[in-house]
Amino acid sequence: MGKASRDKGARFERSLASRFREYGYDARRTAQYCGKSGDAADVLGLPGIHVEAKHVEVMRLYEWMAQARRDAQAGGRNALPAVFHKKNNAEILVTMEFEDWMSLYREWEAAHDLKEREQNG
C-alpha cells in the first residue's frame, strides 16, 4: 500500500472517530496508540463494536468482514465486527453480518417497546 493510500485511510479513520464523537462517543483512531497488533479496531469508542474502516473505490466487503471478524475474535472483547466503508464523494456505509445486525435490531426494538410502554402508562 502506498503512502497516499495509507494517508487517505488514516484521514478516514480520524474523520470516522470525529463523527462518532459528534454522537457523544469518546472515539479515537487506534493506529497511533496500538501499532499493528492485529486485534485492534481501526477506531475505538463504540462499545461492543469492532470498527474496520475502509475508504477505497473498489469494495472487497467479504474480505474486509473476514478481517474484522478475525480481529474482533482476537481482541477477546466479544465485539460485533462491522466495516465502515466509503468511496470518494459518497456517504459512509456500514456492513455487518446478518445475525449481528439482527442482534442490534432486537436491542433497539426492545428499547423502543419499553419507551412506548413508559409513555402509555
Predicted region positions:
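Catalytic phosphate/metal-binding cores of nucleic-acid and nucleotide-processing enzymes, i.e., regions
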Residues: 1-121
